[in-house]
Amino acid sequence: MPDLFAYTDGACSGNPGPGGWGALLRAMDGETVLKERELKGGEKETTNNRMELLAAIHALESLARPSKITVVTDSAYVKNGVTGWIFGWKKNGWKTSAKKPVKNVELWQRLDAAQSRHDVTWEWVKGHAGHPENERADELARAGMAPFKSSGKSSKG
């Protein structure tokens, strides 16, 4: 059975502002790439954190069947949220420890549902540090953002 990886990234021009998300999905056999798929999309008015979340969500939602997958992100917000904070938020009715509503709650709930179908390992990598797959996810996120720098649409592809 191949090893599955999803490399995800979000980008924003201004925060808030036009933004994009990108995901590179790979099925690997050791060092050999068996299959690769690229996903991207964006929004006219968003935040970097929302784009980071959507990259991970779309990567997991794109899998046709329950899978064992490693999701690699350069977002400490996503990694820390999904592997730690989310358990307290759910226990507290989606409120933070300060009793405030969780920001981007609808995306966190969607990510929680998406990952519940799979056996997910989460890894963090430093962004813009020469990690080729993370750099490709960044390129996809920027490509996903490009149409929204001058229009008011939302896209997924």
UniProtKB/Swiss-Prot annotation:
Q: Name the cofactor(s) required for activity, per the record.
A: Mg(2+)
Which residue spans adopt a coiled-coil conformation according to this UniProt entry?
Answer: none
Q: Report the cofactor remark.
A: Binds 1 Mg(2+) ion per subunit. May bind a second metal ion at a regulatory site, or after substrate binding.
What EC number is given for this enzyme? 3.1.26.4
Instruction: Please state the span of the N-terminal signal peptide per the UniProt entry.
Output: none
Alphabetical GO CC annotations of the entry are: cytoplasm
- Which PROSITE patterns does the UniProt record give? RNASE_H_1
Q: What is its subcellular localisation? A: Cytoplasm
Residues holding Mg(2+) 1: 9, 52, 74
Output one GO BP term.
DNA replication, removal of RNA primer
Q: What Pfam family is a match for this entry?
A: RNase_H
The chain positions of domain RNase H type-1 read 1-146
State whether keyword Nuclease applies: yes
What molecular function terms (GO) are annotated for this protein? magnesium ion binding; nucleic acid binding; RNA-DNA hybrid ribonuclease activity
- Family to which the UniProt record says this protein belongs: Belongs to the RNase H family.
Q: Subunit structure, per the record?
A: Monomer.
Annotated protein name in UniProt: Ribonuclease H
